Amino acid sequence: MRIQQVESFILHVPVTGKQIADSTHSISHWGVVGARITGEDGTVGYGFTGTHAHLPSDQLITRCIDTCLAPLLVGENALETERLWWRLARQPALQWVGRAGITTLAHAAVDVALWDLRAKALNMPLWQLLGGAVREEVRAYNTDIGWLSLSDDALLRGAQQAVDEGFTGIKIKVGSTVARDLQRLRAVRRAIGDTITLAIDGNGKWDLNDSLRFCQAAEASDVFWYEEPLWYDAVRAHAQLAHATRIPLALGEQLYSVDAFAEFIAQQAVHWLQPDVTRMAGITEVLRVIELAGAHRLPVAPHAGDMSQVHQHLNFSRTPCAVLEYIPWIRECFEEPIRVVDGHYQRPQQPGASTTPTPQAWERYRRATS
């Protein structure tokens, strides 16, 4: 099937609770910045990257899709996802400006759209195209209850509500002060008991010394993992922390290539890998990370930059993908939204990658691409 047209789009969707914050960001909307690819038979594939809904930077991504990537795709065989991935990745002018940032986010949207189109053309959900299901359901952990912007009371209420809804894992944000975050961590652990897994996420705010201080005191709270404890590409510092604490380290949402993950693994600086199809040039590159993880017997927990619309298919079809983040901000924007029952993702049934926006979302949240 030949590619007939490639178009970009932008949706800005409100987050839960109007405004949320972690240790480094405060946002009111999530950006769904993507590509719509039409095949010669009329089949349409959708893919997107996730942003903080900053229109000028979102328009840099759509401009890259429309002016740099689209000309390389029109007329090509849409089903040849691997070849087209390399065609875009090795385009000399794009390679010169860098294999990260804007060009890679644009590439991610296009790659996901191609996989969506391919699965639709074959009339099967993406997880089936990827080899079929390896599990009946996927364990979810709830992040939406744990923002730093929440009061202590709201944090505890949200944690208890998540447990009541069947979630067996939750994650809370840290990165304000060591003392305050230890207090919140201990309060949540007391509230939810010992049988619920409790992860923390620093979003890279603290330095090595603060992270070491925090971990020394936090180990008693049975922390499932400490996510992004340090600046995202500080491999040596992560290795030092990993060797100094019993808390497993998780990272990867800001890594752009399988090579970056390989370096963290080589330095024994990570225990949980968290690739994101919206940041890593799409599904094609994330599959390579999952293969790498499997070879090293490391678990994978994809980061929900796509709010898990796409990643759920990877969790269902790949053994290393053990758990999956739950943030419900954009779920109602899609024809087949993520579905979580008693704290577990249920298998998508419609053909494709679960990335087709509803007409209502298109009308309500669409923004200009230039």
Indicate where each model-derived feature is located.
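N-terminal amphipathic alpha-helix/helix-capping segment at the start of soluble metabolic enzymes
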Residues: 1-2, 9, 120, 124-136, ...
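Structured beta-strand/loop patches that form or line metal/cofactor-binding pockets in enzymes
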Residues: 1-46, 50-54, 331-333
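Conserved, mostly hydrophobic/aromatic
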Residues: 3, 42, 69, 110, ...
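Metal- or metallocofactor-binding catalytic centers and their adjacent structured scaffolds
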Residues: 5, 38-121
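Metal-dependent enolase-superfamily TIM-barrel catalytic cores that perform enediolate-based chemistry
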Residues: 128-245
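Shared catalytic-loop signature of beta/alpha-barrel
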Residues: 216, 222, 233-344, 348, ...
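Extended hydrophobic packing segments that form well-structured cores
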Residues: 353-370
